Amino acid sequence: MAEMTQQQRRAPWQPSPTDPTEPTLSARALAKARGTIEDFARSYMPLLGLPVDDVLCFADSLYFVAGSLYELDELNERGGDPSQAPAAAALRQFLAGRGLLDDVQATLDVGFEYWTLERRLIAEWKRPQGDAAHEDELLRCACRASACKSFDYSVLALLVAGLTGRTVSKEMMLFLRACFQLVEIEDDLKDYRKDHEKGAFNVYAAFVRRYGVAAVTKMPLWIAEREQFYLDARAAAGLTDSQLKFHVARNESQGGAGPAMAPEACSGGWALPTPILDERLYATI
């Protein structure tokens, strides 16, 4: 990773004179951010060449950014447009004050794309099924949404790198995003019934809507493609032997996500829930 010069580098704990001063975050959003930051620090900071304890040097920045994203996510769930929210403006102002907005903007845009896709899919899933072409398009949108969903982790990776004067390579970011998506897939499988009841986005639900009971054979084919992408990206990311050992051990200790990431813990393969076929899907929202 390329290093910034000492003159360019800002201490991670230094505030910016342009930091936002108006309150834009709820306690609820900050509480949600806590688990994300802990998992990010323990699972991914060592892959960026940073000790886990270094999170304390810029915890305020991580909490503000992650909390802002959760605030926007809650607005999206209420049907609002996150891109125009005060929390979005404050987040951009915060990043710009640290010279990081240009580095992070494209990844923030992925988040706004995810929220747009999520709103569209939830609305479409309330309606009766359409013809095959229409349903195929919805499934493609759901797969794209799955790839975008963990954009918050990508934002945190770029934030930590920027605050510590590092540049994350394209290959490393592709690898991290592949990791993030497999974890999201595992979460969607575990949360399938709960998400069905809540009317929340779930990529497995998208496969069930399109294929019915055959989703249990169709979705593993798609997951296998994602796992191969992960393995290829991992090979190209330039991990040291110690980083690779850490990464696999962390995956095993977490019990997932899937045999490509945790060969021993997931030796039995992916566990897909029984599809819910009544397809009153999301009609209670």
Language-model-derived ranges and their functions:
Residues 23-47, 54-68, 75-196, 243-248, ...:
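All-alpha helical catalytic cores of prenyl diphosphate-utilizing isoprenoid enzymes
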Residues 50-51, 234:
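Flexible helix-coil transition and linker loops at the boundaries of alpha-helical arrays
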